[in-house]
């Protein structure tokens, strides 16, 4: 089928991060947003720097101060940031100047198809997009799915990740409608917020392998297309 970037997000425990990395996923995500269910305080995240180098370490932020991200990069060795707030294209561009070499993923919360129009504003200021289901109070990890058939055949200007309510049981159905560069799972592979279920992660990878998917080590470069 091709190569697929697989990110497991909302990790809070070192033992689970190491075990999930060993299963062969592409990336691990860590929530740096206070007062959210899967928040990992920086003071408890120094172990991120010891994770295997082959796995992408993605910090998830909402309308962050660039200095906060810089501290996370220094302490935890982040290799990418995922921006889930109202960050403008100019702010994303400035972040790239502030932290060269750190990949930027801009999350778009999709409520209506018209929300996809915003994707084209970010085509030259981030390396990838992430499509997530809209929720009025929460920026992610809601367990709500997108309308996959409705999104089919919509073009995006960058490599992109599909998020929103994905599980080992529905991921192949989602991929039958869409052709993302990657997928992002959180609530669909855990027992409770922040407590990942390693068997569910294993089952996810088995489902993908059964259909011929190979796990990508990195997202495509923006100029490689979708």
From Swiss-Prot:
Amino-acid biosynthesis recorded as keyword: yes
Record protein name field: N-(5'-phosphoribosyl)anthranilate isomerase
Molecular function GO terms recorded: phosphoribosylanthranilate isomerase activity
Pfam family, one: PRAI
Top EC class for this record: isomerase
PANTHER family (UniProt xref): N-(5'-PHOSPHORIBOSYL)ANTHRANILATE ISOMERASE
Highest rank taxon of the organism: Bacteria
Annotated keywords: Amino-acid biosynthesis, Aromatic amino acid biosynthesis, Isomerase, Tryptophan biosynthesis
NCBIfam families: PRK01222.1-4
Enzyme Commission number(s) of this protein: 5.3.1.24
Catalytic activities: N-(5-phospho-beta-D-ribosyl)anthranilate = 1-(2-carboxyphenylamino)-1-deoxy-D-ribulose 5-phosphate
Family under the similarity heading: Belongs to the TrpF family.
Position of the signal peptide: none
Chain's gene name: trpF
UniProt GO BP: L-tryptophan biosynthetic process
Keyword Secreted: no
Pathway: Amino-acid biosynthesis; L-tryptophan biosynthesis; L-tryptophan from chorismate: step 3/5
CDD domains given in the database record: PRAI
